[in-house]
Amino acid sequence: MNEKHQTPAETLATEHARTIWWARHLTVHNRDPRLRGKKAPALHCGACQEVYAELEPGNIASTMGTAAAEHIKAAHPDFWVELIAHATRCLEAARICWDRRNIIRPDLRPTLHENELFKNRTNIHVPCPVDCGVTLHDALTADQIQDEATLQFSDEAVEHCITRLAEHLMRHRRSQIAQLL
């Protein structure tokens, strides 16, 4: 995947695909029949049982995520299409929730908090709009905050917050995302 030419939804789906558990099974024994000429350690897909990446000791962490995303896109195109559609809905839901940030329930509104360690930064806490109990935390610089009272931020900060929220929403079911749209 050439990440330079991906849509925001494709980028979000790729990041999420890197963490999908069923595509990241580790084969550590060379006698495993799935290897078929490849050597362990290797990654195999729990859905199709294909061994799709040999791992070297120095690249295990970086290869696992990238290879899993590539495998899902190549070997499971129907799932990939659904993942892109889900990412698109999550981005849309995140934008809608961000636009409604001043009119939603008070406990689901983003809040600003003083950063105790770095005085030149302010922490923003963004609760999950699905109300799952997760609160996303990020730090903003003073120049990214345009108005604290109405939660107005620079375009860069807004895009970052929306992307972070969409990344979290990817973990929720489609029906939960549909309720936000």
What residue spans do the PLM features occupy?
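Short recognition patches in nucleic-acid-associated and regulatory proteins
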Residues: 28-30, 51-59, 133-156
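Intrinsically disordered, low-complexity linkers and flanking regions associated
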Residues: 7-32, 85-112
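Short, flexible, mixed-charge glycine/proline-rich loop motifs
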Residues: 29-40, 113-123
